[in-house]
From Swiss-Prot:
Key words of the record: Cell membrane, Lipoprotein, Membrane, Methylation, Pheromone, Prenylation
Residue positions assigned to the propeptide: 63-65
Gene Ontology molecular functions: mating pheromone activity
Cited function: Activates B-regulated development.
Main location: membrane
Membrane disposition: Lipid-anchor
Leader peptide range in chain numbering: none
Name of protein: Mating-type pheromone BBP1(2)
Record's subcellular location: Cell membrane
Length: 65
């Protein structure tokens, strides 16, 4: 499974949460997600820790939704 597929599965999970936006979703991605086009094109990295506006924790970085 590649990083994009992992992200798609996570996005589906987020959609199923509905209005429960206070939940923090943490997911482990392969290192390739940090080098991939998704992050470069549409998801700026921020310093950890993640909060409910951010969907993935990778080491000391978060991928912002």
């Amino acid at each position: 499974m590649d990083a994009f597929t992992d992200f798609s599965i996570l996005a589906d999970g987020l959609a199923s949460l509905g209005d429960e936006s206070s939940h923090t979703i943490l997911a482990e991605f392969s290192p390739s997600i940090l080098d991939g086009p998704f992050v470069a094109d549409s998801a700026p990295l921020t310093e950890a820790p993640c909060n409910h506006d951010q969907i993935a924790d990778y080491g000391s970085y978060c991928v912002v939704a």
